[in-house]
A protein has these predicted regions:
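Short glycine/threonine-rich turn/loop motifs
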Residues: 1-90, 94-107, 141-144
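In a subset of proteins, long, contiguous C-terminal domains/tails are tracked
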Residues: 132-133, 137-144
Length: 144
């Protein structure tokens, strides 16, 4: 936005407010890259019984790292589906649904992942904001 209040639509601005204040997504998806570059457990699975990728645990063999994966950047998130480390969620709306349920209650999941209520209008606004993080010049490059 760089100080230009007209660069985002009304819905995108409302989505930003949800993202940064009400839902506090910004705790893990901080500016300017919309990531902390830290590994966290986002509650994708209630348990990791060996069938699922156990995340950083595979590297460090530290049980506190079970289910922890690097927090992804949300830049160009509209182009990076399917979502989650294993591609198990196919849409931004479904990602929001996962988080609105407070994840799947893994004992090591990040403390900020808690249940929340969001209306369908608010969900639309949040998705609009997330889509605004798309760099259209990126998709026009030959390498893309």
């Amino acid at each position: 936005q760089n100080g230009n209040k007209n660069s985002l639509s009304k819905d995108e601005l409302a989505g930003w407010k949800l993202f940064s204040e009400k839902l506090y997504c910004i705790a893990c998806h901080t500016q300017p890259y919309f990531t902390t570059f830290v590994a966290e457990n986002n509650g994708l699975y209630a348990s990791y019984n060996g069938k699922e990728d156990q995340g950083r645990f595979r590297i460090h063999n530290d049980s506190s790292d079970i289910g922890k994966f690097k927090v992804p950047s949300l830049r160009n998130v509209a182009l990076s589906f399917p979502y989650m480390h294993d591609g198990s969620i196919s849409s931004l709306e479904d990602v929001i649904e996962h988080y609105s349920k407070g994840g799947n209650k893994h004992p090591l999941q990040h403390k900020n992942i808690v249940e929340f209520k969001i209306s369908s209008a608010e969900k639309k606004q949040l998705v609009s904001f997330l889509k605004s993080l798309t760099d259209t010049s990126y998709i026009q490059r030959m390498n893309f």
